[in-house]
């Protein structure tokens, strides 16, 4: 039980989720406390701005029914710390780290600051080991790497929630003696989405190795800002103290940024691009930069955040700033989804900057780089030929060009498309890749090494296709 250091009855204003407290002395940024209204109910607060004689605090429990007059704020002289334990695996929490599954919290093994402990840049290790998600488009083309931060850029109505649940259920680290865990963070999600995730995790057994932090759209906006930090604090404890490889899946970071804009507006700050605060880049970096590997530590923290692009605009400040901080992006395509292809990846717009160092012999398979480079290059050429075919007609194209059109169809329907409950290993993904690539003549596979093509090319597939 914390003992108050100082109390104030000088609440000037309650503005949205914020309290403005006058005549404060010695109150620190990030300090926690509680506000007690005339009804006697305590609510947790955290200081987010400090002036010469005032402080602004966000109320984590919401300000409904809380008047300025008659309210008392008590500060504890400490920052917000989260009780953590290995026994949190299998639990469902809210955005403040409190139980949402109606069970008591396990005895804490440690208390960790929710703002994290920044990794010394010198102690960081370069990520080089893959995570197998079981999804061919990710594993085959844009491999997720332990310690990487690789976001999904989605849009309203696209199946990013299905993908998040599938990644939580299927992801694994092969050939590692350390444990593997998933921390799932739902930020500002609707009640039906929360029910979907909870039911899915319980039904498939994914919760046995996962911690779920669910912040609902109806929860206070201040909790929305806290939820990703709660999830990452748990992930860091599992990784740095217990040696787990932790995959953190966060959805939806757009809701987080909207909450940030709401708090900024409530504080009367000058808006930046499209009304978002000018410090949004820095704020996002405090979340994304908590991913990584550290020298001397067995574990790792990998981030897989998901955001919905407003109006499918990839130049919007949220995806734009996210792209500057993270190491690539996986973009979902509305046109692919319209064709009935799941997961609907936009292969050309997607990128993983670290994938090249985590694949190949001794990590996945010797032909992995050849397959990835060839598939992307051939598909890019096939899309150009599709556009040409709409102008001149497919029958007016040469036989090689028609092969590319057949390749594009097979690539989308066999390689990219897979079932929601279908899990593919790296080997299965690469074998499907060769099946699809073998539709093309062998001399067209110029992005693959000759010795690799000679070993894996399926000539019988090429010969079986009649144009």
Curated annotation (Swiss-Prot):
Pfam families: ATP-synt_ab (PF00006), ATP-synt_ab_N (PF02874), ATP-synt_VA_C (PF22919). Residues 95-114 are annotated as: Disordered. Keywords: ATP synthesis, Cell membrane, Hydrogen ion transport, Ion transport, Membrane, Transport. One of its GO terms (cellular component) is plasma membrane. It is a peripheral membrane protein. Has multiple subunits with at least A(3), B(3), C, D, E, F, H, I and proteolipid K(x). Belongs to the ATPase alpha/beta chains family. This is A-type ATP synthase subunit B. It comes from Pyrobaculum neutrophilum (strain DSM 2338 / JCM 9278 / NBRC 100436 / V24Sta).
């Amino acid at each position: 039980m914390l003992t108050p250091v100082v109390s104030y009855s000088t609440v000037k204003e309650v503005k949205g989720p914020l309290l403005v407290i006058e005549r404060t002395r010695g109150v620190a940024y990030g300090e926690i406390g509680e506000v007690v209204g005339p009804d006697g109910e305590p609510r947790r607060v955290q200081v987010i701005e400090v002036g010469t004689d005032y402080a602004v605090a966000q109320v984590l429990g919401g300000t409904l029914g809380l008047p300025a007059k008659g309210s008392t704020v008590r500060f504890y002289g400490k920052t917000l710390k989260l009780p953590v334990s290995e026994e949190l695996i299998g639990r469902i929490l809210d955005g403040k780290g409190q139980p949402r599954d109606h069970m008591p919290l396990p005895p804490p093994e440690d208390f960790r600051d929710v703002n994290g402990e920044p990794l010394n840049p010198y102690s960081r290790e370069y990520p080089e080991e893959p995570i197998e998600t079981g999804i061919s488009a990710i594993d085959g083309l844009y491999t997720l790497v332990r310690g990487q931060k690789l976001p999904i850029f989605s849009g309203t109505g696209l199946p990013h929630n299905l993908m998040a649940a599938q990644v939580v259920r299927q992801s694994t680290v092969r050939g590692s003696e350390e444990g593997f865990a998933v921390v799932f963070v739902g930020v500002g999600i609707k009640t039906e989405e929360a029910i979907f995730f909870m039911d899915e995790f319980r039904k498939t057994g994914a919760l046995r190795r996962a911690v779920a932090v669910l912040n609902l759209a109806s929860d206070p906006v201040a909790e929305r800002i806290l939820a990703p930090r709660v999830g990452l604090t748990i992930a860091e404890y599992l990784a740095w103290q217990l040696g787990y490889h932790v995959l953190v899946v966060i959805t939806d970071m757009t809701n987080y940024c909207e909450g940030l804009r709401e708090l900024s507006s409530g504080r009367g700050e000058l808006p930046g691009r499209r009304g978002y605060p000018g410090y949004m880049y820095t704020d996002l970096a405090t979340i994304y930069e908590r991913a990584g590997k550290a020298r001397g530590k067995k574990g790792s923290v990998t981030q897989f955040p998901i955001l919905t692009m407003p109006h499918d605009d990839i130049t919007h400040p949220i995806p734009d700033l996210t792209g500057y901080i993270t190491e690539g992006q996986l973009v979902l395509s509305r046109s692919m989804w319209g064709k009935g292809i799941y997961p609907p990846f936009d292969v050309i717009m997607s990128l993983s900057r670290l994938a090249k160092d985590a694949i190949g012999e001794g990590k996945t398979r010797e032909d992995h780089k050849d397959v990835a480079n060839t598939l992307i290059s051939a598909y890019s050429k096939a899309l150009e030929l599709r556009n040409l075919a709409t102008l001149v007609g497919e029958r007016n194209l040469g036989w090689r060009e028609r092969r590319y059109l057949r390749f594009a169809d097979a690539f989308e329907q066999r390689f990219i498309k897979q079932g929601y409950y279908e899990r593919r290993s790296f080997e299965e993904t690469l074998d499907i890749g060769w099946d699809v690539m073998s539709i093309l003549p062998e001399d067209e596979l110029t992005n693959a090494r000759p010795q690799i093509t000679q070993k894996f090319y399926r000539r019988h597939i090429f010969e079986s296709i009649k144009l």
